[in-house]
Amino acid sequence: MSEYISLEQYNTYRIKSFAKYVYFPTNNQELLDIVNNHNKLFFLGNGSNVIFSKEYYDDVAFVIFTKKFNSFNIIDNYASVQAGVLLQDLAFATYNASLSGIETFYDVPASVGGALIMNAGAYGDEIYTCVKSVTILDLNTKQIKKYLKKDIEYGYRYSIFKYMKDICILSAEFEFEYKSKQEIKAKLDDIYSRRLSNLPQKPTAGSVFKRPQANMPVGIMVEQLGLKGKQIGDAQISPKHGGIIVNNGNATGQNILDLIEFIKQQILEHYNIELHEEQIVI
């Protein structure tokens, strides 16, 4: 730890924020030591679903898992995976082992821990399809607890862990299905081509909003209102996808939040639909 560490590389919007307390634990004991020394913590994976609202953070200790808390082990068609493992790395490792189930997420820039909290989804699949169990740390009792899949409530863009206060996901166990590499690669190639044609290549945190109950995609409504390309500061509604905001270089968290509020107001005014953010504001 040092005075004010940049968080730019730890959020996919590439917001230029800084924090006084930043830690990179390598094991459970180091994590417990950090928990015991700070009252206010934020556990960060790859930062693919977060918005830093401030330039400087003095009161929050950021615990980043993707740098050192990121090992996994594959035996037969099972994998034990620490929270900081990137979905992309796990997807390629399982592909090389002729295992199917996680390849849908190979282009999702999220960590396993973050994906489990939000029940990450892509192209109709959800992360919990392959989950066997999730192990967490209770920050109050300092106890480690394993949840079997049958005991985990989850649904569209949420899991039980999203609403549990003072917990931290440590690891998960996955069960995959054997398939030929050719079949898995065909799916990887299809996802890659769809992403290239439909999604922006600039810094972004992906879909900003949950799909509304009206079941009309936010991107379609934004496009119908002619809002694609709208910009506040360097935050812009992607010209490629109306449900995504990109950073054109120097967007602040406040630029992004102002643009989110603008979109919400426009959708409410013209469609009478209230949008809810999928992303987490810190």
Swiss-Prot record:
Domain FAD-binding PCMH-type stretches: 15-179
Active site: 157, 207, 278
Pathway noted in the entry: Cell wall biogenesis; peptidoglycan biosynthesis
GO molecular function: FAD binding; UDP-N-acetylmuramate dehydrogenase activity
Cross-referenced InterPro entries: FAD-bd_PCMH, FAD-bd_PCMH-like_sf, FAD-bd_PCMH_sub1, FAD-bd_PCMH_sub2, MurB, MurB_C, MurB_C_sf, Oxid_FAD_bind_N
Pfam families associated with the record: FAD_binding_4 (PF01565), MurB_C (PF02873)
GO cellular component term of the entry, any: cytosol
Gene3D superfamilies with a match to the protein in the record: 3.30.465.10, UDP-N-acetylenolpyruvoylglucosamine reductase, C-terminal domain (3.90.78.10), Uridine Diphospho-n-acetylenolpyruvylglucosamine Reductase, domain 2 (3.30.43.10)
Reactions accelerated catalytically: UDP-N-acetyl-alpha-D-muramate + NADP(+) = UDP-N-acetyl-3-O-(1-carboxyvinyl)-alpha-D-glucosamine + NADPH + H(+)
Keyword check for Flavoprotein: yes
Biological process according to GO: cell division; cell wall organization; peptidoglycan biosynthetic process; regulation of cell shape
Compartments where located: Cytoplasm
Keywords recorded for this protein, A-Z: Cell cycle, Cell division, Cell shape, Cell wall biogenesis/degradation, Cytoplasm, FAD, Flavoprotein, NADP, Oxidoreductase, Peptidoglycan synthesis
Cleaved signal peptide residues: none
Enzyme Commission (EC) number: 1.3.1.98
Required co-factors: FAD
HAMAP family: MurB
Function: Cell wall formation.
Family: Belongs to the MurB family.
Annotated protein name in UniProt: UDP-N-acetylenolpyruvoylglucosamine reductase
